[in-house]
């Protein structure tokens, strides 16, 4: 079975993802030759804002009109076991009846903040497999919002009328990255006030896009059609404004950075770092030790070692 055939089989596609996650960079490079033009949508917001429910409702509607949808849910992981804490996306059970959907939870494997090192690789696999719409659900930690900006074409930021105020939004950095703002759970608080606040604060982007603000009650499918319409409008804007090429370039740069950072983190988490810590305590120069660590990563990687 060749790579193209494997990408058409969900079980084989899962195996491809696992191989890449286990360090198969040749496979990661090969996948890049097959990526197409999937639209990538990052969904972020504080825990409890209804991200999983919203993605499930959006996906259901898209699947009903013959889209092929991939969903990557970033789960916080145990810093001890490295395993996902949340496991499968229990709120997405309604999608089980559809054939053209692929859902995978990704453990951050103890990485503090941000996305998994292999999120971009998994997006590339789904893209190469012909999934035309790919959702990335973030944990909502702050750093992952910055990370998802490097991958997604469109970013949905969820707000809840009962959680926080505009000052907290600014602290989270969400005002700078969002393309569409969804005030979800609109029946649980002063949603109209939150919408007014956002419309006053949000400014037109340098690229010419004016962020949208939409009211939603995702659990009751209220606002879903309007959100999809805004996603479609932003996708057309991305393609017509020249932003698509910039986003693809940003995605590849981020992919390279994440692979390099993962190698460095493996060294930092290994027993080797203990000896370096002892040397620091004994008075060895910090600059020399950092140079040694970087050299070690380069040497081991050049040997094809498991760094």
Segments predicted by a language model, with ranges:
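Expand to "…catalyze enediolate/carbanion chemistry for C-C bond making/breaking, isomerization
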Residues: 3-8, 14, 32, 43, ...
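Conserved Switch II/interswitch segment of TRAFAC-class P-loop GTPases
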Residues: 150-168, 179, 183-192
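Long, well-ordered amphipathic alpha-helical subdomains in the mid-to-C-terminal portions
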Residues: 13-15, 215, 226-302
């Amino acid at each position: 079975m060749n790579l193209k055939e494997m990408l058409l089989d969900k079980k084989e596609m899962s195996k491809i993802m696992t191989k890449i996650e286990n360090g198969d960079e040749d496979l990661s490079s090969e996948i890049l030759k097959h990526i197409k033009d999937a639209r990538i949508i990052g969904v972020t917001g504080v825990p409890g804002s209804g991200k999983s429910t919203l993605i499930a409702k959006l996906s259901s509607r898209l699947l009903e009109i013959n889209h092929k949808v991939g969903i990557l849910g970033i789960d916080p992981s145990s810093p001890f076991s490295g395993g996902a804490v949340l496991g499968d996306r229990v709120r997405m059970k309604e999608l089980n009846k559809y054939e053209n959907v692929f859902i995978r939870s990704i453990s951050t494997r103890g990485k503090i903040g941000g996305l998994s090192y292999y999120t971009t690789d998994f997006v590339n696999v789904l893209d190469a497999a012909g999934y035309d719409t790919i959702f990335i659900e973030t944990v909502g930690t702050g750093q992952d919002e910055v990370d998802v900006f490097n991958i997604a074409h469109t970013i949905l930021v969820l707000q809840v009328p009962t959680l926080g105020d505009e000052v907290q939004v600014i602290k989270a950095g969400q005002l700078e990255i969002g393309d569409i703002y969804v005030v979800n759970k609109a029946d649980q608080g002063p949603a109209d006030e939150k919408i007014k606040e956002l419309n006053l604060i949000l400014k037109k982007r340098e690229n010419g896009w004016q962020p949208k603000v939409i009211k939603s009650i995702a659990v009751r499918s209220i606002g879903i059609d309007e959100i999809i319409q805004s996603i479609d409008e932003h996708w057309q804007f991305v393609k017509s404004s020249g932003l698509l090429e910039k986003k693809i370039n940003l995605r590849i740069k981020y992919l390279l950075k994440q692979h390099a950072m993962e190698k460095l983190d493996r060294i930092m988490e290994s027993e080797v770092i203990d000896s370096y810590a002892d040397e620091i305590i004994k008075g060895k120069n910090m600059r020399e030790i950092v140079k040694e660590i970087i050299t070690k990563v380069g040497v081991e990687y050049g040997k094809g070692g498991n760094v």
